[in-house]
Every structure is written in structure tokens, then in C-alpha cells.
A protein has these predicted regions:
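N-terminal binding-site loop/beta-alpha segment at the start of enzyme catalytic domains
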Residues: 1-30, 80, 84, 154
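Glycine-centered flexible beta-alpha turn that most often forms the glycine-rich phosphate-binding loop
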Residues: 4, 62, 97
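Acidic-and-aromatic substrate-binding clefts and catalytic sites of carbohydrate-active enzymes
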Residues: 5-15, 39-44, 72-76, 125-131
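Generic structural signal for well-ordered alpha-helices
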Residues: 13-20, 47-54, 82-86, 107-108, ...
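A short, structured active-site edge motif that brings together acidic residues
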Residues: 27-41, 61-70
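Local beta-strand N-terminus motif with an aromatic residue
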Residues: 29, 59-62, 94, 118
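CE4/NodB-like, metal-dependent polysaccharide N-deacetylase domain
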Residues: 46-67, 87-91, 112
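Beta/alpha (TIM)-barrel catalytic core signal, keyed to glycine-rich beta->alpha loops juxtaposed to Asp/Glu
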Residues: 70-182
Length: 182
């Protein structure tokens, strides 16, 4: 399957859209996920953020649209932004909606104020940072945990090791199952 995870903040939506158009693949063969950045949180702002992303991607419908992160200093704007995602979902402009980087207390407050439970919460998860409590919370609410940096990220080094991929336990499991460490 082909899943492209992009975001307004990455500055690459236009390039992703061009790649999709030049790929020759049927749109149904590509799953596109993008994220609304915090400067587009609010009601109309979020709808405008969606329009900007859809235009850059060259798409009428986005498969998964999520909020890039909570805005704790103005959490009401985070909720308003998500309510705009709910509207886009109801209108068929997006197929699924979710959040990213929400921790348990964000989820608790958030779920009391929205109608649609997020399909996903994209969080940092890897062998050295499993966020078990948050993953249990996801399971309780039917939220899929989607990992970013699932192999340890580009800056996470534990105990002087170079990379999660060099971890002796990971290497041992890879050898045992005849797989690459990745």
C-alpha cells in the first residue's frame, strides 16, 4: 500500500501533489494524510488551512486530516479547529480525521468537547519511548495509535548508542527472524 504522510508545516505538499500526478497511479491506490498547523487553528482558519492543503496537493478529498499538535495556551482554538475537521468529514471533503501529539490530559479534555472520536493520534512511539499509558487510553476510546519516528527518530540516542537500529536486542531479534533491524 502507499501511504504518504505530509503536513502544511513540512512545506512539501505542493511537491507531494506533483509526485502523485506524475506517478501514473490511480488515486485510490494512494492514501494521503496531512496535518493542519497551529496558525490555522480556529473555525474559518482551519477550513482555509484545509483548502490551502487540498489545493497544493491537487486533491478534492484528503484521506486523513489531523491537527498537528494541541495548542495548550489556547485549547479552545484546538477544539474549534477539530470541529472544523468534523464539518469537513460530514461534507465528505475528508475520509477520516484525527490528532497528533496529544497526551492523556489533552485527550481527556478534548473528548468531552467534540462529537467525533479521532480516528488516530499520531505520536512519537519507538522501542525506547512506548507511551504505554497513552496507548491504553487510545484503546479505551477506539483511537488508533499512529507512530512517528517508530525506529527511534533522528535525534534519540540512549546510553551513547548510535541508533535504535544498532541496539543489541533489536539486532538479535532481526537475526532471529531473518529480518532487517528496520
Amino acid at each position: 500500500y502507499r501511504h504518504i504522510d505530509t503536513a502544511a508545516a513540512y512545506g512539501n505538499e505542493k511537491g507531494v501533489g506533483e509526485a502523485i500526478r506524475h506517478s501514473g497511479l490511480d488515486r485510490s491506490q494512494i492514501f494521503i494524510e496531512t496535518k493542519i498547523w497551529i496558525n490555522d487553528y480556529g473555525n474559518e482558519e482551519t477550513l482555509h488551512g484545509f483548502e490551502k492543503s487540498a489545493r497544493k496537493l491537487g486533491l478534492e478529498q484528503i484521506d486523513l486530516l489531523i491537527l498537528h499538535q494541541p495548542l495548550p495556551s489556547a485549547f479552545d482554538r484546538t477544539v474549534d479547529a477539530y470541529k472544523s475537521l468534523e464539518k469537513l468529514l460530514a461534507d465528505g471533503r475528508v475520509r477520516a480525521i484525527g490528532v497528533s501529539n496529544f497526551i492523556p490530559h489533552h485527550l481527556d479534555e478534548f473528548l468531552q468537547q467534540v462529537e467525533v472520536v479521532p480516528a488516530v493520534n499520531q505520536i512519537e512511539v519507538h522501542p525506547y519511548f512506548q507511551q504505554a499509558e497513552l496507548q491504553r487510553r487510545h484503546e479505551q476510546h477506539g483511537i488508533l495509535t499512529q507512530a512517528w519516528s517508530p525506529i527511534g527518530g533522528i535525534t534519540f540516542y540512549r546510553g551513547g548508542e548510535k541508533s535504535t537500529l544498532d541496539d543489541p536486542t533489536i539486532l538479535g531479534l532481526a537475526r532471529k527472524y531473518d529480518k532487517s533491524p528496520a
